[in-house]
Each structure stands twice: as structure tokens, then as C-alpha cells.
Regions:
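Primarily extracytoplasmic/secreted proteins
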Residues: 6-218
Length: 218
């Protein structure tokens, strides 16, 4: 198990409503069906805190994410994309207590490495506002509608050497395997956005899967 060293510092953003904090990214360079990421930081505890996890994996056959638990809480799937070489999904749960815990990602079959990115939301609605996924395209297109004072979070799993995000700020890049790249990005928005053209452009196009979610304020 490892944590990436790029853009690792937790950062908080607010649009006057939702407070968005990028927390961490962790990878596992072992082939498994069930990945347990132990003692992952959840950031500061707060009533109604929403934890968002973007998970991805390389695959040698079509795989999907069957479930995610965050600190023992079953997460809700926001969006998921899958193809024969990779899969990526965004999940979330309300976890009001605890500053760390296990995040368990279960796939439909054995995968070739996996990684997660983790964000925390304070002052956010408990249910996602909009969700989107995309696969087998470059750029990966993830258009989202976002309420005023809301936030958006996205991630992708590919073999591109670099990722360039449009309309979200990249928080991390990690390599669960040398030829795999997992990236995540996020932002807050003061004004309402309708079908904002969020996208990820890859330096090379293969095994492209991505997903994203938006939340409004309480």
C-alpha cells in the first residue's frame, strides 16, 4: 500500500456553502478482488460530513466495482464506467464520526492494481445533485450541473502519461502500476453551473474510464 507524493497536502475550498477538502490518495500494487485500504484519513469529523471516494483499477477482463464501504458505512454509487482494461467509479457516504478508518473496494473479479482518492464535504446535501461517467474516449467527457455554492469531484483511471483537467483542479496523480495512472480533481462553485464541460485530456489514449459527481449545499 502506498500514498502518492504528488499534490498530497489536504486542501479546503468553499464557495460560501459546501466546504470541500481533498484529503488523500492511496494505491495498492497487488492483484486482488477486494482491496482494503486501512486507516485512511477522513479529515475532521463533523455532523453530516460526506466522504467521497473515487476508485479505479486496471483489468484484464471487464470488471465493475461491486461495492465500497467507508469506515464500515456502505457507500452510494454516484457513477461508474467500465471497459475491458479498466474501471472507475465515484461513491459517497455520510460518515459523521471518526478521523480515519478503512475503505474497502470490492470488484466483480480480480483486478490488476487499484487506487482511491478521498475528499470530505461539510455543509453539503446528503444526496448527490448530478452524476456522470464516460469511457473509451479522449478526452474523457464528464459534463456536470452544479448548484450555486456547490462542489464537484471527479476521477479517472487510464494509461496516459499525463492528465489535463478542464474546469476542475487536479488534486492527485498516482501510479498503482507503472503503466496505469489514476487521477482526481475537484472544485467549488459560487454560481450555478449547467452541464459544465468537465473533461480530462490524456497524453495517450487507452483504458480510459472516468466518473464525477456534484453536491449542493444543505
Amino acid at each position: 500500500m502506498f500514498q502518492n507524493n504528488l499534490l498530497m497536502a489536504a486542501t479546503s475550498l468553499s464557495a460560501g456553502g459546501v466546504i470541500l477538502t481533498y484529503i488523500t490518495a492511496v494505491g495498492d500494487a497487488v492483484n486482488r478482488t477486494v482491496y482494503t485500504f486501512s486507516s485512511v484519513s477522513f479529515g475532521d469529523a463533523s455532523s453530516g460530513r460526506v466522504i467521497v471516494v473515487n476508485a479505479g483499477a486496471g483489468t484484464s477482463a471487464a470488471r465493475t466495482i461491486s461495492s465500497v464501504t467507508i469506515g464500515g458505512v456502505t457507500a452510494t454509487q454516484a457513477a461508474q464506467a467500465a471497459m475491458s482494461e479498466s474501471c472507475n467509479g465515484t461513491f459517497y457516504a455520510v460518515v459523521s464520526t471518526g478521523t480515519s478508518g478503512d475503505i474497502v473496494v470490492t470488484y466483480s473479479g480480480s483486478c490488476n492494481r487499484s487506487g482511491i482518492g478521498v475528499w470530505g464535504l461539510a455543509g453539503a446535501a446528503a444526496t448527490a445533485h448530478d452524476t456522470v461517467s464516460d469511457s473509451a474516449s479522449n478526452p474523457i467527457a464528464l459534463p456536470l450541473s452544479i448548484p450555486a455554492s456547490g462542489a464537484a469531484i471527479g476521477g479517472c483511471y487510464t494509461n496516459g502519461a499525463t492528465h489535463s483537467w478542464a474546469n476542475l483542479t487536479e488534486n492527485f496523480e498516482q501510479n498503482p502500476e507503472a503503466s496505469h495512472l489514476h487521477s482526481g480533481a475537484s472544485a467549488t462553485f459560487e454560481e450555478e453551473q449547467t452541464d459544465l464541460a468537465i473533461a480530462v485530456t490524456l497524453s495517450s489514449a487507452s483504458m480510459e474510464t472516468g466518473s464525477a459527481v456534484s453536491f449542493g449545499p444543505i
